[in-house]
Amino acid sequence: MNNFFDVIIIGFGPTGGTLASLLAKSNLSILMLEKEKNLYPLPRAVHFDDEVMRVFETIGIKEKFKNYTIINKGTKFVDNKGNVLLDWPRPKEITENGCYPSYRFHQPDFERVIRNNLKSYKKFKSIQNANVKKIINSKDFVKVVFQDTETLKINIFKSKYLVGCDGANSITRKSIKSKFSNLGFTQKWAVIDLILNKKKNLPDRTIQYSNPKRPATYCRNVGKRRRWEFALKKNENEKKVLTEKFIWEFLQPWLKPNEAIIERKVIYTFKSAIANKWRKGRVFIAGDAAHLMPPF
């Protein structure tokens, strides 16, 4: 493999994959470095809008990927007694971007589609198990030193430019001495993803439960997938919150344990933050490496 590329991208998630597709379409040589060996199989991101679908059309995956999506019908905000505070239906018409205004998706489906599409570009190369150790940002090129997580072999590649799409704990951001500025929002929420094994009369749109004791969100996702998110109370025990007993007690108004399986359970700290510098010389950051925002 050639060890010099137009652009090296660190991180093969949605941001890195989309950027690689745009650059490869422009006939640039791209090297993708990804720390993980395999695609992460569980739900994460679940929503995008018409502007994003327009980008997917640009990179040539819209027709393939739309079969893995559903149109998001909108959101209702209800109080703790179930009274509707706000009904926000999404328009059913195609927008000026030529797409519907809101979509639901399963992130692993998207990553499979975009990775398969990138295989058609001869100038695109990817390396898995690549744990980046050092980024050297010089006047004429960028040098990346990474270690294979299985063989422990050290590798060095160079490029004209480098973009770090390597998440909130970005080594790329640290390499350019960029720091996050906290914009004042920090909350812990549990995110519970489930797969229904029985037909249930659940809402066909997003519901925001505006309960001051425990705000929560319900998402109607693709296929049989459903998601509930709820805020943790101050000093609440995180391990206890993620036990099946606690989860099924929370879900009791909507589901019984024999009606679905828990696919994923995790606690996120939702933050609002922005990096004070997105570029230094030939090195850039993008996605969560550059900014963090709550999901709603």
PLM segments and residue spans:
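Active-site-adjacent segment of FAD-dependent monooxygenases/related oxidoreductases
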Residues: R44, D49-N117, C219-N221
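Glycine-rich FAD pyrophosphate-binding loop
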Residues: A24-R44
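Core beta-strand elements of the Rossmann-like FAD/NAD(P) dinucleotide-binding domain
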Residues: N3-F5, T151-Y161
